């Protein structure tokens, strides 16, 4: 075994959760190692939010580069994966996985420092007791073992650091955050908000997004270039490389190990975690890193894989799996459908509000004041209304 190091804590994964754990532990005085399966990005090269279509060989089209489509048949199902961003998503040929033939699953992945916090859509909504204590209201399944009152101080702490812009609405089913100033609605969204309120009594609000509308903690406010999924050289939206990881690094107690593909947790004779075993992605050398604390922040499926692989005499079915439930009842990100339309009364009206990196949200409206026997719980809508540019012509037949 080549190369061993010892830290107070070892974190697997450098995305949204891994960055936060690193910040908290280093600021508490611990020496921390963060292991990331992919490379470290260079914002000057890898972030493409300021590139124009004429800078790209295929003008940024999603499926034009056939070689990329062939190597990324799963990743290109994600609306964020196109010619500008395909390098931020894994190569499906080099990173295969299997599913039952009759139960396919599209696993969207990004292997680099920051993970999918680079490409996420930044929408940030608080859960309420309508979510956490839903079973007490409708009798279905079980309540969470925590309630909103317990979570609220932690929401406050996160929001003060990363910055969430939005509009306070005072809705019990969607608690207000500690907001930065909200972004403006477009003309079409103003019309839609009025119609929904007058006809249905429903609320439409600007999206609650982790994008700065004023300078915060050394990060500048958004300059409305628009395509946040391509990265942000100014760090105006929340990602771990723009906020939590720099904060952890500033303590002098953070070590980031990139290209480290973790295979399993190292367990002592007493059955307790001692560290992790990983393979260097570039050299194929095997190494171990030890720590008194091991935190898995490698995403739902990767963290589960590592735990199942961590079998030992004390944990024959994988660590923390004496019940055999590990690997069942998982929840990853879901994809969705949608619909669109045209507001003819706004034809010819110029949108002068910039390329806003946000949409609108219609909060849950079902089963709030009274229960509907034929529908369980509720849902919200996300969307936007914007001025169509020349690209709309590509979707018109003929």
Where are these regions (language model features)?
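Beta1/beta-strand and adjacent pyrophosphate-binding region of the FAD-binding site
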Residues: 3-17
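Residues that mark the start of a beta-strand
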Residues: 6-8, 30-31, 201-203
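Gly/Ala-rich phosphate-binding loop of Rossmann-like dinucleotide-binding domains
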Residues: 22, 26
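Glycine-rich loop(s) and the adjacent beta-strand/alpha-helix scaffold that form part
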Residues: 27, 31, 37-57, 251, ...
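Conserved redox-cofactor binding core of oxidoreductases
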Residues: 58-91, 95-106, 111-112, 118-126, ...
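FAD cofactor-binding and catalytic pocket of flavoenzymes
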Residues: 86-116, 120-121, 144-148, 323-398
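A short, glycine/Asx- and small/polar-enriched loop/turn
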Residues: 217-219, 268-274
């Amino acid at each position: 075994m080549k190369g061993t190091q010892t830290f107070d804590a070892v974190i697997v994964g450098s995305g949204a959760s891994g960055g936060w754990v690193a910040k908290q532990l280093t600021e508490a005085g611990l020496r921390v190692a963060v292991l990331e399966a992919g490379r470290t990005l260079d914002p000057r090269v890898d972030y493409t939010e300021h590139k124009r279509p004429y800078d790209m060989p295929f003008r940024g089209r999603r499926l034009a580069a056939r070689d990329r489509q062939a190597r990324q048949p799963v990743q290109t199902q994600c609306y964020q994966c196109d010619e500008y961003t395909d390098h931020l998503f894994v190569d499906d040929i080099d990173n295969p996985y299997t599913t039952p033939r009759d139960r396919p699953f599209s696993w969207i992945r990004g292997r680099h420092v920051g993970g999918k916090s680079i490409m996420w859509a930044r929408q940030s909504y608080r859960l309420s007791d309508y979510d956490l204590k839903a079973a007490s209201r409708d009798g279905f399944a079980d309540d969470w073992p925590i309630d909103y009152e317990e979570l609220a101080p932690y929401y406050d702490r996160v929001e003060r650091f990363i910055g969430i812009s939005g509009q306070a609405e005072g809705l019990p089913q969607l608690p207000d955050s500690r907001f930065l100033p909200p972004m403006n609605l477009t003309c079409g969204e103003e019309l839609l908000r009025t119609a929904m309120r007058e006809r249905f009594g429903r609320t439409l609000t600007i999206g609650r997004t982790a994008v700065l509308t004023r300078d915060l903690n050394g990060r500048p406010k958004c300059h409305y270039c628009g395509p946040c999924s391509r990265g942000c050289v100014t760090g105006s939206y929340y990602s771990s490389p723009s906020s939590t990881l720099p904060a952890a690094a500033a303590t002098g107690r953070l070590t980031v190990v990139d290209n480290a593909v973790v295979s399993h947790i190292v367990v002592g004779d007493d059955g307790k975690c001692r560290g992790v075993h990983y393979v260097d992605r570039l050299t194929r050398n095997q190494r171990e890193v030890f720590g008194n604390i091991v935190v898995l922040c490698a995403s739902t499926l990767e963290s589960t894989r590592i735990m199942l692989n961590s079998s030992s005499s004390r944990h024959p079915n994988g660590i923390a799996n004496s019940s055999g439930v590990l690997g069942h009842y998982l929840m990853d990100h879901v994809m969705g459908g949608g619909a669109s339309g045209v507001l003819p009364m706004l034809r010819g009206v110029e949108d002068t509000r910039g390329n806003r990196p946000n949409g609108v949200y219609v909060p849950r409206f079902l089963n709030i004041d009274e229960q509907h026997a034929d529908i369980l719980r509720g849902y919200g809508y996300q969307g936007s209304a914007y001025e169509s540019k020349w690209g709309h012509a590509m979707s018109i037949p003929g």
